[in-house]
Amino acid sequence: MEFADSDKLAVGENVMAIGNPLGYDDTATTGIVSALNRPVTVTDDNNNEIVTNAVQIDAAINPGNSGGPLFNAAGQVIGINSSIASTATSSDSAGSIGIGFAIPSNLVKRVADEIIKDGKVKHVALGVVIKSDTVEADGVTRGGATITKSSATGSAVVSGGPADKAGLKEGDTIVAFNGNAVNNNYSLLGYVRAAALGDKVTLTIVRDGKTMDVD
């Protein structure tokens, strides 16, 4: 199977999900890309929250679809189906309500390549403490992730870390990551998690009411 560049996905594109929902083998469902870079939070075995900026789709996926491919109209893999939003009170009664999520193919391919090569995945960190916030700059109010002091350590920026080296400081609000809007702290965490070790990125920040880019 060929992997497409998930960075080139557009809202409204046709998609097809393949999987074994509820034990029904080789089931195909269709829909469209409903949204991009949708922060989705899951909890791992150690009760740590993991945030991924997912592809949101309206194709019906249910328990048993997770791990199955999501294709575009050209038959290329654009993601791996992972989870759904649900109004159910337990996972046993959860089912599709037209809001499903897939891990973008670019992230899938990078993680798979790292596991094949090194047997593990290396994740990056900015080295900052953040909180969801709103900020005004150039007459526009927007959401973002503001760097704030940790109640545990009393520091906002890790000394010598990537953010420190880029000149970020307490009170800066990050509003974009490589040109993609950062609406809250979960959005930023998703972009950071998708980045590879050694990647160079541009952050758009608001400092003292002014917008600027830092690398």
Give residue ranges: language-model regions:
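A structural signal for short beta-strand/turn segments enriched in small hydrophobics and glycine
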Residues: G12-I18, G75, A163, G171-I174
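Gly/Ser-rich catalytic serine loop of serine hydrolases
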Residues: F3-A4, V55-F71, T148-A166
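Active-site loop architecture of trypsin-fold serine endopeptidases
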Residues: I18-I32, N37-G67, F71-A112, N185
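Residues located in well-ordered beta-strands
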Residues: A28-I32, V129, T146, T204, ...
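Interdomain regulatory linker/hinge segments that flank or connect interaction modules
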Residues: A10, N14, S82-E136, V206-T211
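PDZ/PDZ-like groove recognition
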Residues: I116-Y191, T211-D213
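Conserved active-site neighborhood of the chymotrypsin/trypsin-like protease fold
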Residues: M1-D26, N180-Y186, Y191, T202, ...
